[in-house]
């Protein structure tokens, strides 16, 4: 009798482990992924090459951009996961005009997949605009 009970308990334990592992499976669909909103980008991306550089052949430079995000660790972590080039400047409004409850974030295009990075950033609800940054 105890061996049957052990088998049953083992089966139930495995069932719940598998069920828990499948929480991200298609059986439990998540909400739709946010769509990128490229209208949030206020500068021309056309001159930027695949390496994220723009300018004459003998003077290529990365393009810096700035955005405002909520002044929370969660928002900073989310943005940093999307864009490893980003640096945060608490207390600075930047040219873009971040409010006191926001943090200025500055990144640049000189990274692999820079277009995808910008698209991901525009899909964040709290990102209202991405402007070119001139580092003044």
Residue ranges and their predicted role:
Residues 2-12:
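Bacterial N-terminal signal peptides that target proteins for export
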Residues 22-25:
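N-terminal Sec signal peptide cleavage junction
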Residues 27-85:
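N-terminal secretory signal peptides
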Residues 72, 109-113:
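Helix N-cap motif at beta-to-alpha junctions
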Residues 93-108:
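Surface-exposed aromatic
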Residues 94-96, 132-136:
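Short linear loop/turn motifs
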Residues 121-131:
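Short acidic amphipathic segments
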């Amino acid at each position: 009798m105890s061996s049957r009970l052990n088998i049953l308990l083992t089966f139930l334990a495995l069932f719940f482990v598998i069920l828990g592992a499948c929480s991200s499976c298609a059986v439990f669909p998540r909400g739709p992924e946010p769509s990128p909103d490229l209208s949030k980008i206020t500068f021309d991306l056309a001159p930027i090459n695949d390496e994220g550089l723009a300018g004459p052949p003998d003077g290529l430079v990365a393009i810096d951009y700035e955005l405002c995000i909520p002044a929370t660790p969660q928002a900073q972590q989310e943005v940093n996961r999307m864009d490893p080039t980003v640096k945060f400047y608490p207390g600075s409004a930047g040219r873009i005009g971040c409010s006191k409850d926001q943090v200025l974030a500055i990144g640049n295009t000189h990274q692999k997949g820079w277009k995808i990075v910008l698209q991901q950033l525009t899909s964040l609800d709290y990102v209202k605009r991405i402007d070119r940054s001139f580092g003044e």
